[in-house]
Amino acid sequence: RVRKSPYYESTLKYGVTGFTVYNKMYLPTGFSDPSKEYESLINDVTFGDFAAERQIEVSGPDALKFVRYIQPRNLDKCDIGSCKYIILTDMDGGIINDACLLRLEEDKFWLSPGDGDVILWLQGIAINSGMDVAIHEPDVSPLQISGPKSGKLIQKLFKGEHDDLGYYKAMQTSLEDIPMVIARTGWSGEL
């Protein structure tokens, strides 16, 4: 079964030109001419429905121990509010998937993996790990804001409150009483 994001109707309203299926969800693939979208990405600001980048929450007293177990990266400097690019590996070091790891609280992490059933893999490991962790999909739907003017948009939306959010950092906040997590991870090199 393929799910629709909470933004699905809005993408139709604003002229989505196509969808692909990613993580068992519809992911918009474009709204106009691809070269115009590229120009917006490198010169202006873009805003996208990335709800298909489904988050996985790992929480509990052994959350850090569990996250260390599923990937080889040193997390000694993964403080609350840190984001890390990680590679999820099997017991022989083979790559399962990659993900962005966000540490939201002392014992709460979010993983944002690529396409695949990573949550089932993590739940399977947790069952027999002896670690005190809970693994589930939080009810969140990511949006992505990119481009060299994205910082100005965030500044305007949050009235300058998060101007100091560093690269590969995240924080829990709210906008007009809507709780959210904002993360600055970008891949387009605009900021």
Where are these regions (language model features)?
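Acidic, proline/glycine-enriched N-terminal capping motif
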Residues: 1-89, 94
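Acidic, low-complexity central loop/insert segments
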Residues: 97-191
